C-alpha cells in the first residue's frame, strides 16, 4: 500500500493562508467608513405602568 505524500502540504497550507489574508485585506480595504461618525442621542420614553400610578399593599402587617 503506497504512503501518502505529505511533502507539499506545508507549501499548500502556507499559500492558502497567504491567499486568505490577501483576500480579506482586499475585502476590508473596499469597505467605506464614515469619516466623522456622529452620536445620535436616544430618547427613552417612560411608560406609565399601573404600579407607578397607585401604591398597593403587597403584604400584611405583622401582628
UniProtKB/Swiss-Prot annotation:
Q: Which residues get modified to N6-acetyllysine?
A: 57
One MF term in GO for this entry?
proton transmembrane transporter activity
Cell location: Mitochondrion membrane
User: Is the keyword Hydrolase assigned to this protein?
Assistant: no
Biological role: Subunit 8, of the mitochondrial membrane ATP synthase complex (F(1)F(0) ATP synthase or Complex V) that produces ATP from ADP in the presence of a proton gradient across the membrane which is generated by electron transport complexes of the respiratory chain. ATP synthase complex consist of a soluble F(1) head domain - the catalytic core - and a membrane F(1) domain - the membrane proton channel. These two domains are linked by a central stalk rotating inside the F(1) region and a stationary peripheral stalk.
Q: Which family does it belong to?
A: Belongs to the ATPase protein 8 family.
- Quaternary structure and partners: Component of the ATP synthase complex composed at least of ATP5F1A/subunit alpha, ATP5F1B/subunit beta, ATP5MC1/subunit c (homooctomer), MT-ATP6/subunit a, MT-ATP8/subunit 8, ATP5ME/subunit e, ATP5MF/subunit f, ATP5MG/subunit g, ATP5MK/subunit k, ATP5MJ/subunit j, ATP5F1C/subunit gamma, ATP5F1D/subunit delta, ATP5F1E/subunit epsilon, ATP5PF/subunit F6, ATP5PB/subunit b, ATP5PD/subunit d, ATP5PO/subunit OSCP.
Q: What is this protein called?
A: ATP synthase F(0) complex subunit 8
Gene of origin?
A: MT-ATP8
